[in-house]
Every structure is written in structure tokens, then in C-alpha cells.
Amino acid sequence: MKRGHIIAILLAGVLTVSMLAGCSSQPGATQGDAAGDTLQDTLADTGQEGNMATAEGEGAAASDAISSDVLMIARQGMFSSGGTVTEPVEGEYDPTTNWMDITRAGNTAHVDHANVFYQIPVNDNGNPIVYLHGYGQSRMGWMTTPDGREGWSDLFLKKGYAAFLVDQPRRGEAGATASMTMDGFLDTWAEDSKDYKPGDQAWYTHFRIGRVAPERYEGSQFPEGDEAQDQFFRQMTPNTGNFDQTLDAAALGAVMEDVYEMTGNKAIFVTHSQGGAVGWDVPVENISAIVAIEPGGTPQPGSEQYQRLLEAGIPITIYFGDYIDNGPEDIMSTGFWQAVHNGAVQFAESYNADGGDCTVVYLPDEGITGNSHFMFQEMNNDVIADHIAAWLESKGLN
């Protein structure tokens, strides 16, 4: 079948009843919703609870008959978390002209929220994972690979980890922003966008896939071929407004609250690149562990971020790929990644000395070579997923 694997969405009628009864709290209403309404209330009223599908009376038997390699989803759906509602545009709304009124008088907009797609597996182990993408990316990066294999969300779903895949505010399916006009164009597009929009070649070099596209570094795990590179570049997702780390962290805090209300469990927070920098600012109350994949930086010892993580006792592991210590010295990005890696090592040393729990994994030291900044999309992404799963198990999160 497509992408070489089967996704079976199975839920017997009895399971539907039991899960609905056991999940009385769902992600709460975002600002502007009627008081007391919840996401579950809204979906239940419309008969759309989690876009669920059922296989009446066949769940247990089918589960026994199907290979363990098949991904079986009990429930899936989408919701938004956080965000604000803009003040009404000056003037009175006229329903007779509605969208033809270019003044937008009386209109409001729901903006700057995060959007979440979730999947809960039949073998849910009670340790949900919240995934946050990096710069120029969306949740798609966790869900597949450039050559069409299973992404990390599928690999961890098979291990029993529910997936909550985030598009951060002003990105992807969370594109509505206060800096956007009602017709979908940025008020500040001309002056803001061109200054920080790398092209394909710049991404390729900075992400350590190869020196210049389409060549790959020797021993690279990045998928081979023109089609894989084409698919990778087409994952790139622009911002619809200015990046705001404080705003993003608040929205992710709301996501964590919603996941806790929905599952009754704290979440493992898996971040990547720019998302890693945001991740350190997210409120910690509903986070059980952090897995940071080449984060854009790490907290300074003694900082507010650092103390918050330390006091919460959150275990942290930080992963780095190849071509850092051995990267081309004439490429400025090599120095950047060396500094980021060294900063992470210093963070871990301080965090552990102060009673915390942090490991920094440099994959070549583990005998895992050839990985770029996108290790979760490369040909050995399953090997790295297993490595992380072993760490989670060592923390009792399995």
C-alpha cells in the first residue's frame, strides 16, 4: 500500500463508549468560546468526536489477527489551543455587504493559536508525545520522510505513544495572525518577508545534508535521489507573521494543558531546532520529559528557564547528528553547530551538577553516523527512534 505501511483505524463500539466515558475532559475552549464549553462538548454535539471510525464487534479479534507492524489508531482528531481574539474593527458590521466590505467594520478574528493533530493508538501506554517542529517546518516533518517511509510519529505510535503534532502559531494550519489582513495577506509582507527567507541551497548547507545541493556528505543517511530532495524542499513552510517566541511558548503551554485534560497524563515534549528554543520557555507543569533534537540553543545556567526546568525535575536528553566536529571549516554553519553542541554540553554539566538529569547524545559516539539536522527523516530514523525509546524506558516513560 502507499508508503509501504498500513494504517488501520479500529475502534469497537464498546471501546468507543469506554473511551468517551474515561475521557470526560478534553482540550478546553479557546478564548472567545462560550463559557463552560469544551472541545469534547462541541464535537459530541455535532457527532464528530475525534473523527473516529468504528469496527463494530471486531476490535479484539482484528487486533489479534493483524501483524504487530500494523499501526492501529483508536482515536484521532484536531483542535486549536491558545490564541487571542482581535478587537472589533471600528464601525458596525453590516451583514448585507459582509465580505464585500473592504473596511472590515465590526469584524473580529481568532488568531495566534497553535493547531494540533492527534492520534491515540490502540496500545496507548499513557505517555503522550507533543511534537514541535523547527523553523521553516510544520508538523508534516514528524509524520513522513522525503522518500515516503514512516516518520517518527508513526514509529512511536507503534510503541504505544500517542502523538500530538503541533503547527506553531503563524505557521501551517495555525496561520491566522493578528498581522494578517482579512483577505489573507500580511500587512507587513513587503518589508518583513524578504529579509529572512533562506532558499533551498541555504537550507541544504545549513542543515548539513551536503556542501551544495544535490551532493550529499560521504556516508550520509539522507534519502538518495532527486525525488527525495524534491519532497524534502516541498515540506518547507513559511511564517504568516513575525516569529514571536513568547507567543509561541504561551500557545504551547495551552497545548500541554489541553493534552493533560484530554489524557490525564503529562506529555513528553519532543522539539526540533527553533522549536527547541521555544521549548525551554514552555510552562513545565504538564511536561514529563524533554527530547530536544539539535535545539537552536540551551538555557544559560541560573536563568529563569534553567531554574524552572531544574525545580520541576524534568529529565532532558539532547541529540546531535554528524558533520559537526568533522564538518567543513570553511562553511559558517559548521561553527554555528559546534557552538550549539558545546553549549548543550555545558548546559548538561551544570544541570547535572545542580541535581538535574540531562544527557547529550552525539550520535557518532553511539556508532550512529551520517545524520544531518533532520535525523528523524533519514534512512536510519528507526534506529534513532529506538535509541530515544530506550532512554524513555529508563525514565519509566513507556
What residues fall within each predicted segment?
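Conserved alpha/beta-hydrolase
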Residues: 149-174
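The feature captures the conserved acid-bearing segment of alpha/beta-hydrolase catalytic domains
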Residues: 292-363
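Gly/Ala-rich beta-loop-alpha elbow adjacent to hydrolase catalytic centers
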Residues: 270-279
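N-terminal cap/lid segment of alpha/beta-hydrolase-fold proteins
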Residues: 59-124
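Catalytic active-site module of serine/aspartate enzymes centered on a nucleophile-bearing elbow/loop
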Residues: 374-398
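Conserved acidic catalytic loop of the alpha/beta-hydrolase fold
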Residues: 246-267
